[in-house]
Amino acid sequence: MTPRHDRPSASLDIALVSEHASPLAALGGVDAGGQNVHVARLAGALADRGHRVRIYTRRDAPNLPAGVPMREGVEVRHVSAGPARPLPKDELLPHMPAFGNHLEHEWRAAPPDVVHSHFWMSGVASLQAARALGLRLAQTYHALGTVKRRHQKDADTSPPDRVAWETKVGEGCDRIIATCRDEVAELAAMGLNMDRITVVPCGVDPALFIPSGPTASRPANRALLVQVGRLVPRKGAAVSIAALPRLPDAVLLIVGGPPPAEVDRDPEVRRLKALARQAGVADRIVFTGGLPPEQMPALLRAADLVLCPADYEPFGIVPLEAMSCGTPVVATAVGGQRDTVVDPDTGRLVPPRDPAALAEAVAGLLNAPERAAACGRAGRRRVLSHYGWDRIAAATESAYRDVLAAGLAVARPPCPTVSMGAHP
């Protein structure tokens, strides 16, 4: 059986590889976030276009079946690679050869037309299998080691050879699908071929995140500020807390992390609560813990403003979700947020790690409700014109078609063997 490379107008058999970010995972954990959503929504939108999609993710529990139908046209395949239990993603590199071997074995019997790997370690495993079988490979990084190392420095727990592997994957794949302009600049600095890079942003479901509908409860006579995301320091919750003394009439809702029943035991929540007590704003901050995705639209609609103050953000889906709900956004001018949030039309962009600038931007919108409402309407229009999953899937499919039409114009060496601590 061979892929249908000679049928460019036919529906495609697509393999999405997402080694640590299962589309079936609950969101809010340290390693569960935007990539999980992206892979799930992209797969569904590609299936809506008539394609068959298989998603490959690592088996992290012994009782998981080999395959799980996610919806019509989409199946999640669990790959045995390393122990069948949750592992931090920074510990998964030694298990990528086994992951790649599994892919090669399965694809030899049923080869996809195109492979699209998500995250760099997925790229390592996918490159191993794709090159062995002559399959076309697209790569989306979602985050780059150069950026993480620059910002986290000694706190970066990535494997020491991550950047070298990211470069090797970028050199070996047929197309890099970047998510924003900042990422393209980073890839150029890594020396990767700009002619093989296509920008396709992440998306949002504008039929789910809508301006009208039920809203979550909110405090009386106070502005509601909402911050949503994984509870890790780089997401900037500490900056929002530090800004709150300058916003005496606002309440801050921080959404994310462990389930609500466990939130008070979370080390990051404890750290942030200590900062809130020191700042004298503990009575105006609520930590909800992780909430089900279906609750998010009502919560975002209830907010006066949504805050996205990350130190760095490879893309950032929360601004899109807020804008789709018609809620203005105050975000840091980093990564994909520089593309999605248009200052002053859909919200405000501020420097990272600057509580005073964040507070000033928030106060400016809270004190100008007509301007804030106009930002919300403009944000909704921007989502509809640029970021619906139908548009994202069409652009992604176009990148796949380009790869298939071009074939392998450049012969590349086989992917080297991966080993613990090995340099590519």
What is the meaning of each model-derived region?
Residues 1-68, 72-78, 408, 412, ...:
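N-terminal subdomain of nucleotide-sugar transferases
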Residues 182, 203:
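Carbohydrate-associated surface elements
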Residues 217-235, 241-247, 253-255:
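Conserved donor-binding/catalytic core segment of Leloir-type glycosyltransferases
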Residues 266-294:
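Nucleotide-activated donor-binding/catalytic signature segment of Leloir-type glycosyltransferases, i.e.
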Residues 290, 298-303:
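Short alpha-helical donor nucleotide-sugar binding micro-motif in glycosyltransferases
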Residues 311:
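Aromatic "clamp/platform" in nucleotide-sugar-dependent glycosyltransferases that forms part
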Residues 328-331, 341:
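Short hydrophobic beta-strand element within catalytic cores of glycosyltransferases
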Residues 343-344, 348-355, 364-369:
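Conserved acidic donor-binding segment of nucleotide-sugar-dependent glycosyltransferases
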